[in-house]
């Protein structure tokens, strides 16, 4: 205790007192850290709120259940056979209850508007998961209100909020008019408040919900509640072997959101890097002014380890202050991102989101700030320790000698870039998981920072030599300034280059992807109408029921009609999309292009073989003619690979790992549901003239001719990629503000130098020219490095091939002209 007390006393007198005495510089340093923390918190809020609706499938749904709940999730998404559920009931002796559910997030048209709901079907045993709401008594004693279709139930508070009365029709996209209505309401809103923000529709049974969601005979998942003290893991695993997996309840994220969260992680990391670099720059200036004092303290007997620890403590204090300052602005920034972009990213998904302030944000902000502050202080503190007290005492007045950037940042930076290139070249073929690609981008950004640190001062000297020919006095002063503050200049350039590269890369991907995807239908299916229950890149599994298809076929009036069927083999970020088509018809040939002989490929699909996208084949390690084992609704089966295909149009799931099969095989082995219908017309004008025939069916359909596809696809891809672009520019803005902070600190720091320069005849105009020249050279260097790092970085493409994105999970390729060559790049993960 005595040692701790002595250490605290020393820290308070030497370090805290210095921070308080120089409060202006301390505040500016903390503001710099707060800018980085603001970016981190804003992105983390967006990320957490985007995934919150998908907690409805697991964590939110089981909030009232006892500890030990096991969720059984099928290998084929949303397709847990009822036979498996029955076996769980019969063969898991230690289970108190087995609760199957059928659920989906879906937009619902209610009271003249559209809102996202969590459609949930199950027995009254659901009360064991969410808490009691008198389900059995209400089902027994209260008759549902009369209305069209099946009766559904929702919280009374939600019905009142939207002015929805009992008996009114509830329309779900993909179902014909008159399919469902509001039959009951219940007042126990607190039971479902955490599930999709309370926007829940309860179906009377799993069978009814399955019919609404085109999955009869299957449950979405099942929850097994163990008896007290019972261990059910082994029995559950035995029953579900080959069909499903078991574990604690977890969110069911769309595959594209797995990739989005990884990208948001990258932006959050960029915010941390910005915060560290901001703190490094501001703390460098603050420490330089106190080096002589600290050297004197060391010379009169202070232990070097104690001084080093005290300096790190100073960094932690400045970081803590900056982190706390960044919490309110971070929450406001996160709320803005959520309102501006989060809702558009979830449009059509059925998810409902809102910003939630939690005490955890304070802890995260404080922790991020402390990390920034400590990392920023390590360099100056280590140098103070390395130089010793005498050298530090001789540094009164600031930096006394030219600084040199060592060679190691260049060597390490180039090494990191080389590693990123190799990893992303492998990743681009699809054989590595998505998180490896994101980690590769992170490594590349770190490489950009280190290379910039080495290049910036040397590049500045070349530009200064040119300036010296025109303005000798200004050039010499500027050269001396850069040499003395080389590290500060290098870190400032690295800060701006890293943030600007992120912004340029994100914007390039958005612009290129938007233009190319908007023209896909006109190029592949110009004379057809595409009919779907969801918009382009809506994050849900849209479906067209059999009764809706009959309406569509009738409206087609004898024209050629073809369907696409879809299911998903679930494995998180590496989910595999199963697509069923009529092999070799006009629609399938427009969507998928075999790499080998087309006739042989389509014949193979007719005979029960499968096709794989290049990414799927790479991940499975197979080629044409090989046999591969794949999960099905009944367990693993073997299939012969008929060939490799290239997808030609973006799919709504934005997944490039695709298995192509005949319609019959997709329905029997993977329980695929119809998700899109194409109707052929003699011309594009004729197709446009018949759009209203399908819109008037009242089934909530999206009907695409060329112009509608161009408009909706542009909005879809923009709303999905724009948040990353804006976040990149926000990081860049934070970096720019931090440099303004550094310039202000620098002017305060060098007041003695400016007085000395005035004494030897330097005019105020020359001094101003030096400041402008410093900023101009910094801007010119950063512009060059950022363009190379943005257009050529893995954020918009592989580092070695500037036009090819590393996010190679979508099989759809767009093209970007580089010189005279066209390079493919895939749109999104």
Name each model feature, range by range.
Residues 16-24, 266, 305, 309-322, ...:
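Alpha-helical transmembrane segments of multi-pass membrane proteins
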Residues 2-273, 285-288, 344, 520-529, ...:
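Membrane transport/envelope proteins' first extracytoplasmic loop
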Residues 489, 493, 675-680, 691-812, ...:
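C-terminal transmembrane helical bundles of large multi-pass transporters
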Residues 280-283, 316-348, 360-386, 415-429, ...:
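Small-residue-rich transmembrane alpha-helices
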């Amino acid at each position: 205790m005595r040692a701790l007390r002595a250490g605290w006393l020393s820290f308070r007198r030497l370090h805290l007192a210095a921070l308080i005495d120089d409060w202006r510089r301390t505040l500016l340093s903390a503001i710099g850290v707060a800018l980085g923390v603001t970016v981190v918190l804003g992105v983390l809020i967006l990320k957490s709120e985007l995934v919150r609706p998908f907690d409805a499938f697991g964590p939110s749904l089981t909030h009232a259940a006892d500890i030990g709940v096991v969720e059984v999730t099928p290998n084929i998404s949303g397709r847990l056979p009822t036979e498996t559920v029955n076996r769980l009931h019969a063969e898991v002796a230690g289970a108190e209850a087995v609760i199957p559910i059928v659920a989906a997030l879906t937009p619902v048209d209610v009271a003249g508007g559209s809102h996202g709901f969590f459609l949930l079907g199950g027995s009254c045993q659901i009360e064991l998961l969410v808490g009691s709401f008198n389900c059995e008594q209400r089902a027994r004693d209260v008759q549902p209100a009369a209305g069209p279709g099946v009766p559904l139930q929702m919280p009374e508070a939600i019905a009142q909020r939207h002015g929805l009365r009992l008996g009114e029709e509830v329309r779900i996209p993909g179902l014909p008019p008159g399919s469902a209505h509001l039959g009951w309401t219940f007042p126990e809103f607190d039971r479902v408040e955490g599930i999709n923000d309370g926007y829940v529709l309860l179906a009377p049974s799993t069978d009814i919900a399955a019919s609404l969601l085109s999955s009869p005979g299957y449950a979405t998942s099942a929850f097994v509640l163990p008896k007290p003290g019972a261990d059910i893991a082994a029995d559950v695993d035995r029953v579900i072997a080959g069909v499903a997996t078991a574990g604690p309840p977890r969110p069911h994220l769309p595959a594209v959101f797995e990739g989005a969260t990884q990208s948001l992680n990258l932006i959050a990391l960029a915010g941390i890097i910005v915060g560290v670099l901001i703190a490094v720059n501001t703390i460098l200036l603050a420490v330089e002014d106190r080096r002589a004092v600290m050297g004197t303290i060391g010379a009169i007997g202070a232990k070097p380890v104690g001084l080093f620890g005290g300096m790190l403590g100073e960094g932690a204090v400045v970081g803590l202050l900056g982190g706390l300052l960044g919490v309110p602005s971070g929450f406001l920034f996160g709320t803005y991102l959520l309102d501006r972009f989060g809702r558009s990213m979830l449009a059509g998904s059925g998810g409902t989101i809102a910003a939630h302030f939690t005490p955890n944000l304070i802890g995260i902000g404080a922790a991020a700030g402390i990390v920034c502050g400590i990392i920023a202080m390590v360099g100056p503190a280590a140098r103070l320790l390395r130089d010793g007290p005498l050298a530090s005492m001789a540094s009164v007045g600031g930096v006394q000698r030219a600084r040199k950037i060592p060679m190691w940042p260049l060597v390490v930076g180039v090494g990191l870039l080389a590693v990123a290139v190799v990893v992303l070249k492998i990743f681009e073929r699809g054989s590595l998981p998505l998180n490896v690609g994101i980690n590769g981008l992170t490594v590349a950004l770190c490489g950009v920072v280190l290379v910039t640190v080495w290049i910036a001062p040397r590049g500045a000297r070349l530009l200064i030599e040119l300036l010296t020919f025109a303005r000798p006095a200004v050039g010499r002063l500027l050269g001396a300034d850069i040499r003395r503050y080389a590290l500060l200049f290098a870190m400032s350039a690295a800060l701006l280059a890293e943030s600007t590269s992120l912004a340029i890369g994100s914007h390039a991907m958005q612009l290129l992807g938007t233009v190319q995807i908007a023209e896909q239908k006109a190029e592949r299916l110009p004379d057809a109408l595409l009919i779907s229950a969801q918009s382009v890149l809506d994050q849900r599994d849209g479906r067209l029921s059999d009764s809706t298809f009959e309406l569509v076929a009738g409206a087609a009036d004898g024209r050629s009609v073809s369907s696409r069927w879809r299911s998903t083999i679930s494995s998180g970020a590496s989910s595999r999309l199963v697509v069923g088509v009529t092999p070799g018809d006009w629609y399938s040939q427009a969507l998928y292009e075999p790499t080998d002989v087309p006739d042989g490929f389509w014949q193979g699909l007719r005979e029960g073989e499968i096709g794989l996208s290049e990414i799927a084949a790479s991940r499975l390690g197979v080629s044409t003619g090989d046999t591969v084992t794949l999960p099905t609704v009944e367990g693993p089966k073997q299939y012969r690979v008929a060939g490799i295909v290239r997808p030609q149009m973006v799919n709504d799931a934005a997944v490039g790992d695709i298995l192509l099969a005949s319609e019959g095989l997709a329905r029997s082995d993977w329980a695929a549901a119809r998700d899109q219908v194409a109707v052929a017309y003699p011309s594009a004008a004729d197709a446009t003239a018949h759009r209203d025939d399908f819109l008037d069916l009242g089934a909530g359909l999206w009907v695409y001719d060329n112009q509608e596809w161009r408009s909706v696809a542009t909005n879809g891809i923009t709303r999905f990629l724009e948040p990353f672009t804006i976040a990149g520019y926000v990081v860049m803005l934070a970096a720019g503000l931090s440099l303004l902070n550094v310039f202000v600190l620098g002017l305060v720091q060098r007041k003695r130098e400016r007085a000395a320069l005035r004494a030897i005849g330097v005019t105020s105009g020359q001094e101003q020219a030096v400041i402008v020249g410093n900023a101009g050279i910094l801007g010119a260097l950063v512009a060059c490095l950022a363009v190379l790092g943005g257009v050529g970085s893995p954020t918009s493409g592989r580092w070695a091939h500037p036009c090819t994105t590393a996010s190679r999970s979508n099989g759809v390729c767009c093209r970007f002209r580089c010189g005279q060559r066209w390079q493919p790049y895939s749109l999104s993960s």
